[in-house]
């Protein structure tokens, strides 16, 4: 199906029964996702996303449920680097990424939603402005996607009667930070991990180190 076929299919939706239109719409989105994956695979210069070992339909459903709950309750944390008028667009892109893609797709599509400059505090304590780092979109996309992915894994583990999840390195690092290296291979209570990533207080020091920016760590089912 080429881009003209997709356009024709979309226009035809309005003339089809609701069930058929919904199925066709889903098929179109899946084809677009496959096309993106194929084009991405042919470009080895792209930065690699984290390796999400349990990023399957079941985990995606649980992760989306977590995101939708945050948005509905007003608990969603929007980065200060997002333009205030772009938060809703970013939430939509994040949901789309969780449903079909990964953090790299989110980075590529959210880059234009960031501010150009941000406030900074100098060593003397003075306030100034500085250009947002080039890696800002990567850090934002990776951090948010991985956080909801981990929440999805933890929620899935609980629903499936599993007691724990395991921390693993989702991105190769030749010189991992000592505090990150200590976490690799540890098994943590799934409920405690979920509570912490939802913003609740927990006591386990290991759990408190999950979700830190640019750590390269994630969790998987055991």
PLM feature segments, named:
Residues 217-218:
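Long, His/Glu/Asp-enriched segments that create or flank divalent metal/ion-associated functional microenvironments
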Residues 212-214:
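Short, solvent-exposed loop/turn segments at the edges of secondary structure
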Residues 11, 15-16, 29-32:
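Basic polycationic patches enriched in arginine
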Residues 35, 41-210, 222:
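Domain-core detector
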